[in-house]
Amino acid sequence: MLSFLRFFGVTVAAVWFGSTVFFTFFAGPAFFTDEMKKLVPPPYNGAIAELVLSRYFILHYICGFLALAHLGADWMYSGKIPTRVTVWLVGGVLGLSLLGGLWLQPKLHQLQHVKYADHYRLTATAQQREAAAKDFGMWHGVSQTMNGLVFLSLWLYLARVIQPGDPARFVSPINKFGLDRRA
């Protein structure tokens, strides 16, 4: 069971980190290349990027909750208490992902619609569009900073998960839960 838990934990961390690398360096920037802008001009390329980004956040939520479940299962079966650093890495990345997907992304969506109000058949003054463009740039920078923190944190988490660590001391998983006392 412990080898399965180890394999599961490494798989979750690798998928989580790998998806972040793929989206950050390959998929995300592809929406804003000259080739893409010829196929799908602004603001529609940004709208398509938003759709993909929403799925990216769902993947982050799933991986985050699976990583937390793995930490709990590893503690229950091996008796090893997860280190604070590992718990903070998983909790921090999951928290940033929830913040990005549930608060920041809708904010950017709204600002993009005001910025390109004419394309979306909305009414907005030139000042509102200009303010939305400025705010969008600032919040997009915040989003990129958060993504950088997520990237580095997941890299550290993956490095921690692939290390075998020390065996549990003075704790037998069977005795921990009193399962050796069969009546």
Where are the predicted features?
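Interfacial loop at the N-terminal end of multi-pass membrane proteins
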Residues: 2-84, 109-133, 173-176
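Cytoplasmic juxtamembrane regions at transmembrane-helix boundaries
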Residues: 72-91, 161-183
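Amphipathic alpha-helical coiled-coil segments and their boundaries
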Residues: 97, 104, 125, 132-135
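Selective detector of the "anchor" transmembrane alpha-helix that sits immediately C-terminal
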Residues: 11, 15, 65-69, 145-166
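Physicochemical signature of membrane-embedded alpha-helices that form the seven-helix bundle of GPCRs
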Residues: 8, 12-15, 59, 89-92, ...
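Individual transmembrane alpha-helices with interfacial aromatic-anchor signatures
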Residues: 52-53, 128-151
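Hydrophobic alpha-helical membrane-insertion segments
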Residues: 12-21, 89-106
